[in-house]
């Protein structure tokens, strides 16, 4: 079920699978990026999400200020959730790939659950849904 729908992002919850899918649709400015990330955190708390999929396939560049915000502000809240798996669908955009590589390099030492990268949603969902 879709719980958030904007031109730049959507969030779907599959409650029976304890799964959240945050899908990006092109470029998001700082306000939009942070709004969607914070909404996903809120929904994860509300629905006790265990598996998180970041679908970045169509996402564009992430500004440096938003990368810093993700590491310093968003990550501690994400770590406080009961997430057991995080699947990331890699963007087709080279600038997004560079931003994600930089952010994940800073985040990975703090993560206590598996993170895997995928090319498509179906493969990511199959991995996330496996025990």
Which residue stretches match the model-derived regions?
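Amphipathic, Lys/Arg-enriched alpha-helical "gate/interface" segment within cytosolic domains
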Residues: 1-131
């Amino acid at each position: 079920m879709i719980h958030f729908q904007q031109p730049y992002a959507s969030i779907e919850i599959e409650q029976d699978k304890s799964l959240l899918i945050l899908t990006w649709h092109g470029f998001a400015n700082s306000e939009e990026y942070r709004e969607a990330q914070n909404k996903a955190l809120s929904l994860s708390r509300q629905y006790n999400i265990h598996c998180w999929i970041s679908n970045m396939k169509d996402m564009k560049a992430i500004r440096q200020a938003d990368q810093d915000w993700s590491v310093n502000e968003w990550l501690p809240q994400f770590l406080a959730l009961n997430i057991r798996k995080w699947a990331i669908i890699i963007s087709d955009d080279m600038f997004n790939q560079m931003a994600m590589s930089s952010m994940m390099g800073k985040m990975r030492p703090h993560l206590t659950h598996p993170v895997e990268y995928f090319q498509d949603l179906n493969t990511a969902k199959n991995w996330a849904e496996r025990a």
